[in-house]
Amino acid sequence: MAGGDNNSQTTNGGSGHEQRAMEEGRKQEEFAADGQGCGLAFSVPFIQKIIAEIFGTYFLIFAGCGAVTINQSKNGQITFPGVAIVWGLAVMVMVYAVGHISGAHFNPAVTLAFATCRRFPWRQVPAYAAAQMLGATLAAGTLRLMFGGRHEHFPGTLPAGSDVQSLVLEFIITFYLMFVISGVATDNRAIGELAGLAVGATILLNVLIAGPISGASMNPARSLGPAMIGGEYRSIWVYIVGPVAGAVAGAWAYNIIRFTNKPLREITKSGSFLKSMNRMNSST
């Protein structure tokens, strides 16, 4: 009997070790699936995010810079407001297309700003930025091939006035953009389904405001991609420093006023409108 008890205890102990090992294995798989693993072992979901960022940035830059190039080559047939609308719509549709996969950053400044606020893992920042740069460069290269490589139709961004003026303007409009993104995409009290519409509308407004002065980049990849293809690096630092500083400041500004993580319904339980809605739901 004693031998039988020892055997059963050994068996139970072995199964316990196996269960713990299986649990640890599942945790490691989940850890890697979230892209949090160390080293170069990228998980399939993380690779999917990178591909989504490449495609999203490509189509965004292709549509926006394509509108700029066509407007230049066809004597302004699209018009400046038309170009602004194209940029806004391009951002909106791509947010809805791949936002649920990668978060739809399409912008190294946005990725970096999220990381500084601990809303994006730092170790994924280089891969995201590289994907965004690749997408933007490929899009600019495609436009260069389509329009015969003519330098007079440069779809990049150049200051119309002084570098300081464009720097300040890029800081302000990127601050505005990142503030909106933080509100609609990271706050659980916001209506997430409207994120694409809100961000696209913000892009449209910013292009209308700053387009004639700085080109309304708001995105280092948007400026660096065409600059590398066209070989035009004049004042490129403006479109790196301004958007990065503006995005980080905008993200932190919203982070400061984010006083709670509770949903809106829990915060405003005393509101008469929500009370009436609750009564209607309970009565039905």
Curated annotation (Swiss-Prot):
Location of region: Disordered: 1-28
Gene3D superfamilies in UniProt: Glycerol uptake facilitator protein
Domain of life where this protein originates: Eukaryota
Short motif (NPA 1): ranges: 107-109
Induction of synthesis: By abscisic acid (ABA).
UniProt xrefs under Pfam families: MIP
Span(s) of short sequence motif NPA 2: 219-221
Ranges of compositional bias, category Polar residues: 1-12
Tissue and organ expression note: Expressed in leaves and at lower levels in roots and anthers.
Subcellular location: Membrane
Transmembrane segments: 50-70, 78-98, 129-149, 166-186, 194-214, 236-256
Coiled-coil ranges from the UniProt annotation: none
Keywords, alphabetical: Membrane, Repeat, Transmembrane, Transmembrane helix, Transport
GO function terms (MF aspect): channel activity
Topology in membrane: Multi-pass membrane protein
A GO term from the CC aspect: membrane
Skewed-composition ranges (Basic and acidic residues): 17-28
PANTHER family, A to Z: AQUAPORIN NIP1-1-RELATED, AQUAPORIN NIP2-1
Similarity section: Belongs to the MIP/aquaporin (TC 1.A.8) family. NIP (TC 1.A.8.12) subfamily.
Entry text on domains: Aquaporins contain two tandem repeats each containing three membrane-spanning domains and a pore-forming loop with the signature motif Asn-Pro-Ala (NPA).
Summary of the function given for this chain in its UniProt record: Aquaporins facilitate the transport of water and small neutral solutes across cell membranes.
Name of the protein in its database record: Aquaporin NIP1-1
Organism: Oryza sativa subsp. japonica
